[in-house]
Amino acid sequence: MAQPNYSGIIKFIFTPITSLTTIYIFFSEEYAWRGFLQNIFFDKFGKKLGVIILGMCWSLWHLPLIFTLYTPEAPILGIILRSIHIVGISIFLGYLYIKTKNIWFCAIIHVLNNSAFLITNSKESTITYHDILIVSMVVLIFYVPFLFTKEYKNNLE
């Protein structure tokens, strides 16, 4: 007699639980970085420098993931690549939070960002200097211009 296959039922039960847990994790991270720390960094360093330093700190926060999950095969290049990207996305998420005061928008963009990196990142690939150049160009073209919006006008003046 064949054993019943419960995999569909298990996926049906655990997918919503996993999704809720994932959303909670991203919401919590954005609540801490954008909702709490961003204003502290803005008050201490001004908005432009504050968001860059916040992005650097956020990059340090991700070091364990960079070493173990994202790029264990090329840790130094991985740190450079991911740090550039994390500072860039931090600029955009900071802008988004200033404009909307909505942590949920930041959490959703964070989820989409991480999903895009997981989809494009293959275990068989090794990070190269070319990858760093491409990510740096994307950050310069798409994220850095947000530093020059009125929302990032320096509040230390």
State what each model feature region is.
Residues F12-Y24:
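Membrane-embedded alpha-helical segments that form the functional core of polytopic membrane enzymes
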Residues P16, K48-I53, I80-I84, W104-I108, ...:
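Hydrophobic alpha-helical transmembrane segments
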Residues T22-F27, S59, R82-I86:
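Residue-level hotspots within the lipid-embedded alpha helices of multi-pass solute transporters
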Residues I23, M56-L65, V111-N121:
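Aromatic-anchored segments of alpha-helical transmembrane domains
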Residues F27-G55, L69, I98-N102:
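Membrane-interface helix/loop boundary segments of multi-pass membrane proteins
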Residues G46-G50, P75-I79, K99-W104, I127-Y129:
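Membrane-helix interface segments
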Residues P64-I76, I80:
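Interfacial helix-loop-helix junctions of multi-pass membrane proteins
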Residues K101, I109-E157:
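C-terminal membrane module of polytopic membrane proteins
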